[in-house]
Amino acid sequence: WCRTDPTCTAVGVERRADRAANARANAENLTAPGQFTVIDHDLTEGLPDGLPTPDAVFIGGGATAELVDACLARLPQGGRIVVHGVTMEAETLVVDLSGRLGGELMRFSVENADHIGRLRGWKPARTVVAWSWVKG
């Protein structure tokens, strides 16, 4: 997102200090100064104060109905939300959201070649479920 145009900005919220540090390092290497801000915060405690009104929201893991509802309430008309997850709970959540609100629901998986003794086989990664919706 930030790399598409120098005027684009993004805010990341991360509860784990190591992941927040990694996000900051990536931002320093991949975006212009000030384009990407990381806030250290546990979203199970609600959204942090002072967030700008989003054009889009991406939840990459740890989604709950309460978090999605809080994000939907802040999302303006025409804003997009995308929720990804790999757990059965996340899949249940996005299937419910898709049933209630519509949007696009998909699952995708990746397999990598790996050794099985002297032979090789496919080793699957966790399947990702994704839901995307635009507030109309």
Predicted features by range, described:
Residues 1-2:
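Aromatic pocket-lining residues of Rossmann-like dinucleotide-binding sites
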Residues 5, 32, 75-77:
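Helix-to-beta-strand junctions that scaffold the AdoMet/dcAdoMet cofactor pocket
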Residues 7-11:
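Short beta-strand element of Class I
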Residues 13-56:
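S-adenosyl-L-methionine
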Residues 14-18, 22, 66, 89, ...:
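Conserved active-site and cofactor/substrate-binding residues in soluble primary-metabolism enzymes
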Residues 15-17, 43, 62, 86-88, ...:
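Short, ordered loop/turn segments at secondary-structure junctions
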Residues 39-82:
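Active-site segment flanking the S-adenosylmethionine/decSAM binding pocket
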Residues 68-132:
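C-terminal substrate-binding/active-site "lid" region of AdoMet-derived donor-dependent transferases
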